[in-house]
Amino acid sequence: MAAVRVLVASRLAAASAFTSLSPGGRTPSQRAALHLSVPRPAARVALVLSGCGVYDGTEIHEASAILVHLSRGGAEVQIFAPDVPQMHVIDHTKGQPSEGESRNVLTESARIARGKITDLANLSAANHDAAIFPGGFGAAKNLSTFAVDGKDCKVNKEVERVLKEFHQAGKPIGLCCIAPVLAAKVLRGVEVTVGHEQEEGGKWPYAGTAEAIKALGAKHCVKEVVEAHVDQKNKVVTTPAFMCETALHYIHDGIGAMVRKVLELTGK
């Protein structure tokens, strides 16, 4: 009986040793080590706002959609805006200027940023992997004079500096809605989209912007609202957003396409 017990014990020990090994003779701890991966570093994205409200600042739905998609993509976001007066203040219930009222772009943008915002003068491309500009008339009124001067517009000096810094560093830039005119003005020859080039019965009410973009020396690429155009050479990604009169979820989807492409171009 003693001999039997010894034989059984030896076989159990052998079986235990066998089951503790995977093919190739690895223990469970060794197998686990093979599945460990180093977390990918988060892309650091600068979001540049132009106020708060579609007619005199940032289009709020666009800014929110960008933030949601950046969050889903695991990005670290820092929000910026220039510390300058707005061109004017619009009463959004009437769509008309509020006479005698003035507001600051940085202060108004802080509403969207929930107070966590930095002066655009402090934005350096060296500290970020990408920059994104939502639309809204603030891009054409506060970040530039496009709303008044069209193709002869001037771009805010800090906005121009930021666009050039990111471009020269080979870091991606995302712009949606009317904001692509900023890239068209500053980065000559860039490819952008603001959607279609004909109004098509009011579906594309700002289609004339495409001609102004061409007049600035940029290339306009026709895209649907759910699409994003990628200028691979310049690493500029654009989507029409509210340049199109359509359901909000389509605009959200197009912005998602833009954000995903921007994050892909960061390589993170």
Curated annotation (Swiss-Prot):
It is found in: Mitochondrion. Gene3D superfamilies: 3.40.50.880. Its main location: mitochondrion. InterPro entries: Class_I_gatase-like (IPR029062). The modification N6-succinyllysine is found at residues 203, 223, 233. Residues 1-41 form a transit peptide. The modification N6-acetyllysine is found at residues 151, 157, 164, 203, 219, 223, 233. It comes from the Eukaryota. Disulfide bonds: none annotated. Keywords: Acetylation, Mitochondrion, Transit peptide. GO terms for cellular component: mitochondrion. CDD domains: GATase1_ES1. PANTHER family: ES1 PROTEIN HOMOLOG, MITOCHONDRIAL (PTHR10224), GLUTAMINE AMIDOTRANSFERASE-LIKE CLASS 1 DOMAIN-CONTAINING PROTEIN 3, MITOCHONDRIAL-RELATED (PTHR10224:SF9). Belongs to the GATD3 family. This is Glutamine amidotransferase-like class 1 domain-containing protein 3, mitochondrial. It comes from Homo sapiens (Human).
